[in-house]
Amino acid sequence: MKKRFPTLLATLIWTALYSQHTLADLAEQCMLGVPTYDQPLVTGDPNQLPVRINADKTEANYPDNALFTGNVIVQQGNSTLTANQVELTQVQKPGEVIPLRTVTATGDVNYDDPQIKLKGPKGWSNLNTKDTDMDKGKYQMVGRQGRGDADLMKLRDQSRYTILKNGTFTSCLPGDNSWSVVGSEVIHDREEQVVEVWNARFKIGKVPVFYSPYMQLPVGDKRRSGFLIPNAKFTSNNGFEFLLPYYWNIAPNFDATITPHYMERRGLQWQNEFRYLLAPGSGTMALDWLPNDRIYTGPDGTDKNATRWLYYWGHSGVMDQVWRFNINYTRVSDPAYFTDLTSQYGSTTDGYATQIFTAGYANENWNATLSSKQFQVFTAAGNSNAYRAQPQLDMNYYKNDVGPFDMHVYGQAAKFTSVNPTNPEASRFHIEPTVNLPLSNSWGSINTEAKLLATHYQQDIPASFADNASNPKLKDSVNRVLPQFKVDGKVVFDRSMDWATGFTQTLEPRAQYLYVPYRNQDDIYIYDTTLMQSDYSGLFRDRTYSGLDRIASANQVSTGLTSRIYDDARVERFNVSVGQIYYFSRSRTGNTEAIDNSNATGSLVWAGDTFWRINDQLGLKGGAQYDTRLGSLTLGNAIMEYRKDADRMIQLNYRYASPKYIQAAVPKVYNPDYQQGISQVGTTASWPIADRWAIVGAYYYDTKAKQPASQLVGLQYNTCCWAVNLGYERKITGWNAQGQTSKYDNKIGFNIELRGLSGGHSLGTAQMLNSGILPYQSAF
């Protein structure tokens, strides 16, 4: 099966590419069956507009009534009534300026206005209020999907309300009764964009499958409390699944969605989402709760019927133009949560959940941010060594135009604690004054910078840690002071291209010298520091490591050259960059990692990036980094993508990370798979293969491990009022240490979706592609 899967995917893509079937846009197809109001709109008070009547025969008793027979047409403003016979009655009530005018129509009665069309054997209408009744008739909305029939239909409040007695509603086009909602009373409110149904029976074809004493269906995008579109699917992991979201419009600045999510194999999960808008900003809180999961038995396999949950809080806002508040907090009950359960707030590939709170104040020349940072790592080893920064205070002060100089002072104070009581903890204080001398004109710039990096650590070292000979020898109190000097200059040349009219090419050389003296930092533990990726832009960074625990020495020159091509609309069509770092002396911090323990000098780090947008549909992008200290190509990636539109796309990609780079960047990683390095080739595609049919596929193969990393194929059929998709996914979910093999999860999914209630008519390819463990990302 493993060998056949790429062949199957390639065959499907080949079939799609060479299909000669001409596809019309689904939205256009659906709107062909929806009536439109194509008459000029009449403005003004309808009661003041004249009534025009045409008929083959007329009998009148002026001014009380008149009888019209034969091809009768009654028009007033934007409303038109046609019938075989119409009786017009006019009654002048005492004290009323305008007489009450009504019409009673019989025989093939049709009524239409810009909102709705009605048809039935008998009808009545109040020409003053536009209230209209129709016996045993049919209706269809104008300009949007929605139709049905009823024993009695009423239009009220200038056609805002359609009231049905023993009526039906469906978004399917005429001639298609795939699904419908039947109720003893149905009220469609066009202003609030909702359909309310009492004694509702949901039917597939002619078969009732669901009953509710009351139901609401949204028929637009306006906020209103009520049940949203239900969703049903089947997966091999969870069995049959059914979701019935309820939207609660609490207030203009508060709303919530409560979704009971039934999973045949696991039980009933409650998905709750609350949204708010306040003076300090807007945010979302979510709580997913699954009591007594019938499959999951806990990390150690002994906790039967475990309760599983997710909590999320996201917030962003500015208050009084100076205060800033941001929250990105996610916590789950167990490391396997995102592997077993689908959530928009995280995925298996994240590896951890972020828990960050920040509050900041910004003024003209300074700002301060107080934060709390923590991470829930989804591996036992990673979580036991995770650190919290609680609290962390960052401050910046800016003073520009001090003569020719710009000044900046950065300061930080942080308290680091570990979830593992045997790990060291620390308080860190850092100050970083900087002086810049920027010079620039229209074609170039040069910036000279000098700064001082002063850091103090007060470390709390447990006795068990200090007594372990394999651990680094730390000091309780450490002071580290480092000066830094940098000169960075770049020039931009441009010229018109002879062989492409209107095109412009640039040549942008750049050079930077950086000096930081060496300080041995073996006596400082690593709390928030990792090796940063050395792409082309990274060649011109000040730091090799993120955070402050390691500041590598530097006596180096970084040089680079970028060339860009712009078309006549100033859209960038091509660029290529290549650069290097030349080391006059080895860069080190004092630790014993491979990248820091090399004595090599000279041109050690090379990096290049390129992008080529061949046309509006086809593009290429890639990059590579080489580090002679590790003796290998460290990172590489390449993407080629053809994207005709949102539903027609083919992407080929490759990504590489060397084993030595991974060990240098994440030295404590345990998984042997990752220690081999990463070398993955993949393809992602989506394409309509026939009228209303669309297929997606994704396949990633790890050439190092010689095994598939992810496989996904999905097939969707779309109509104007429903869609169904069938998908298969096989993904790595973990590592079997005992058998030294990857753990796989195979999932087959079947999903049904009701359509036509809102404006969306996509083929569903984006949703299927984003459901995979490696979601699709556009190359350009």
Swiss-Prot record:
Belongs to the LptD family. It comes from Yersinia pestis. Its main location: membrane. It is found in: Cell outer membrane. InterPro entries: LipoPS_assembly_LptD, LptD, LptD_C, OstA-like_N. Residues 1-24 form the signal peptide. Keywords: Cell outer membrane, Membrane, Signal. The keyword Oxidoreductase does not apply. This is LPS-assembly protein LptD. GO terms for biological process: Gram-negative-bacterium-type cell outer membrane assembly; lipopolysaccharide transport. Coiled coil: none annotated. PANTHER family: LPS-ASSEMBLY PROTEIN, LPS-ASSEMBLY PROTEIN LPTD. Together with LptE, is involved in the assembly of lipopolysaccharide (LPS) at the surface of the outer membrane. Pfam families: LptD, LptD_N. Component of the lipopolysaccharide transport and assembly complex. Interacts with LptE and LptA. One of its GO terms (cellular component) is transporter complex.
